[in-house]
C-alpha cells in the first residue's frame, strides 16, 4: 500500500520536503545505532575484564582449608562467563562493522536518489510560483471588472467605457493563462510527486528491513550469550552440588593429613630401660676427638684391590650379573667374620668405615670345538639376542670402554657383524613400508569379496595415525629439520617361496643354491612384499618363476630384533577393517637405517614430507606468541561400477592440533592464557561438523557457509594437556583431536583417481583389465598421488598367469598387487591387465581395490585461520588417503 502517495499532499505542497528530510534521517539513525551497539560492546568488554579479574581473584584464593577446592569451581565459572561476554563483544564489534558498512551504502543510495528526484523539486518550485501569481491575476481581473461596472453606472463617455472594457479583457486573458499554467504545473507536480513518494517509500522499506535485520542479529547475539551464560550458571550449580561436604573433607584429609598412627601408652619401666640401653650404646660407641691422619686406613693404606682372574671353586656358585661380572660379597657380612683385633670402646681410629667391595671379572671361556651349523646358528642367535647396539656410529659406551681397558676379553666379532646386518635389514624394512600404513596385503584381511556385503562403506581403514599432525614426519613446531628415511622402491626385500606354493613354482631350497639358511627369529617382522611363486620378474606369455633372493638379505633375516638405544620414531599405523585405530606405536630406527638413507640420496628426494622436526621450547612467562600446529587428515571412500564414470564417494576428515610440551606450564600458570580462537574457511562443501564437545565452542547462529568460527575451552584444554603430560611426561608435544567432518561428492570429478574394471570369465581363460586415470579437479591443489597400489583378488587355483605390467603375488592372501609410480597430471592414466587359466571352472569376478596417499592438499579445500592474538601457527599439514576404494565389474 502506498502510504506516502496518499498522505503527503496539501495546499502548501510541503509533502516532498517532509519525505526528503525523512529519507535523509536514515544515515543519521544508522550512525546512532552503531554508537549504541558500540557502547553496549564497551560495557560487555568491561564486564568481561571484570570477570577475568574476578577469576584471577578466585585463582589466588588460599589453598589451605577445606573450602580450597571450591575456588577452582569459581575460577572455571568466572573464566567461562568472561569468555561468553568477550565473545558477545566480538560479535557486537562485527555487527558495528556491518552497520557502518550499511551507512556508507546508504549515503551512496541517497546521493543517487537526490539526482533522480531533482525534477520533482523543480516541479514543486514551479507550482509554488504559479500558485503565487494566480491570486494576483484574479485580483487584477476583479478590479478591472469593478471599474468597468462603476463607469457604466456613472454614464461616462463611450470612449472611457471602451478603455475599461479593453483592460477588463486583458485581465481576463491574464487570469486564464495563469489558470492554465497552474493546471499544467499541478499535473506535472502530481505525477512527479507520486513517483517520488513511491521511491521514498521503497527506500524507507528497504532501510527499515535492513535495520530490523541488524537489530535481529543484535538480539540473537545477546540471546545466544544469555543462553551460554545460563548454561555456565547451570554447570556452576551442578559442580557445586557434585562437590559434597564429605568429598571436601576427604580431600583435605588425604592431602593435608599427618598420619593414621595414634600415640600409644607408655610404661615407665620399659621406657626407662630402653632409655638406659640407648645411653649405654651411645657411651660405648662414642669416639674421642679425632685428628685427621690417625685412622688406620689413613696411616696404613691398603694395597689397591687386584682384579682376581682365578676360577671360582667348583663347589661354590658365585653371583654373576647379566654382563658377566661376579660381585664378591662384603667380608663384613660373611657368617665367618674375622675377629676384631682392636677394642671398640676407646679407639681413636675409624675402624667402622665400610670396606671396599671386590669385583671378580669372569674370564672368557675356552673356545668350543667346531659344531654343527644348527648349533652354531643357535649359539649365534643367543649371543646376538643379548647385544645392545650403541646409539649411533660415533657413540661411546663408557661402562664397557673402562672395563675393556681393565683387561676384559673382547667378544667375537662375527656376532655383532651379523646382528648389525640384520638390524640394517629390519631398519630398511621398517622405513620401506608405506609412510601412512602397510601395503594393501593387509587391506582385505577379513573381507569376503564374493558377497555384496563387502561393497558397503561400513569401515574406514586408516593409513594415517590421527594422533599427530605429522605422524612420523613432523612434531609440529619450529625447530631445525632433520631428515628421516622414507620408503624407497629398492627397499622391498623378497621372501623365499613358501611350502604352500605349487610344485612347479616353488623356489628351490637355500641349500640347493649354496646358501645356508639360518634360523628365523621368534617374532619376525612381516616383509613388505611376498613374491612367493609369482615374483616381480613375471613376463607376459610364460609361467611365472620365483624371483631370485638376495643372499645377503637372507642372512640378514637370521638375526633377531635388537633393542636399540637410538631415538625412537613413530611408525605408521597398521590398517584394519574395523574402526580406525588411533594409537601411535614407537618403532626403533637404528643407525644402519640412517646410513642406508645416506647411501641413497634419492631417499630424501622421494620423501620430501618425511622430515622430522623437534618441538619448539616454550619459556614460562614468555611474551611471544605461543606456537601451535594443525593437521587436516581426510579419507576418501569410493565405489565404482564397471566402466561408468560416475561413482559413490564420501570423504571424512579430522582436524588435529598439536601443542608443545612447554605450553602446559604456560597454560597452568598465571595469568590465565588467552582464549584460542580459530576460523575454518572454505567450508561450503562440508555437510556435517562434529566438534569435540568437551573442548570446542561454536556459534550456531553463523549464517556464512564459507566460514565457521570456533574457540576452545581453555580450562578443559589445559586439563587434557595435563593428563597427557602425566601419562607421557617425556613427550615433546601433545596432540588433541578438535573436530571431525564429512561430506559427499557426486560426479566423475569427485575423486582423485578414476577406476574402471572389466572381467571376461570363460571356462578356460579369464581376462581382467583395470584402467585408472588422474582427476586433478578433485583436490583443492593438484598434487601427485603416492604409494599407489592396485589389488586384484584371485581366490581360486590358476595356472599360466600373464601380467602386464609385472605384479606381486601374495600366496597367503591370494591376490595380485600392482605397485605404481606416483600418479599426477603428467602421465596420470594407464591400463593394467591380467589373464590366467582357471583350474576349477569359470572365475568369479571380485572387486578390485586401490590405495594411495597424497601430501600437501585436501579434498575439501578447508583451511584454518587464527583469530586474535597470543598464538601463532607454526605449521598446517594437509593430506588425504584412501579408505574403502573399490571398483566392481
Swiss-Prot record:
Subcellular location: Membrane, Clathrin-coated pit
Paired cysteines (S-S): none
Mediates interaction with the adaptor protein complex AP-2: annotated segments: 267-442
Cross-referenced InterPro entries: AH/BAR_dom_sf, F_BAR, FCH_dom, FCHO1_F-BAR, GMIP/FCHO2-like_FCH, MHD, Muniscin_C
Stretches for region Disordered: 294-352, 382-596, 826-849
Pfam families assigned: GMIP-like_FCH, muHD
Residues in coiled coil: 156-195
Gene3D superfamilies named in the record: Arfaptin homology (AH) domain/BAR domain (1.20.1270.60)
The keyword Metal-binding belongs to this UniProt entry's keyword annotation: no
The entry's keywords: Coated pit, Coiled coil, Disease variant, Endocytosis, Membrane, Phosphoprotein
Modified residues (Phosphoserine): 295, 347, 372, 530, 616
MHD domain span: 625-888
Residue span, F-BAR domain: 1-248
GO molecular function, one term: AP-2 adaptor complex binding
Subunit structure: May oligomerize and form homotetramer. Interacts with AP2A2 and AP2B1; 2 subunits of the adaptor protein complex AP-2. Interacts with DAB2. Interacts with clathrin (CLTC or CLTCL1). Interacts with EPS15, EPS15R and ITSN1. Interacts with AGFG1 and CALM. May interact with ACVR1; linking this receptor to clathrin-mediated endocytosis.
The family this protein is said to belong to: Belongs to the FCHO family.
Name of the protein in its database record: F-BAR domain only protein 1
Gene: FCHO1
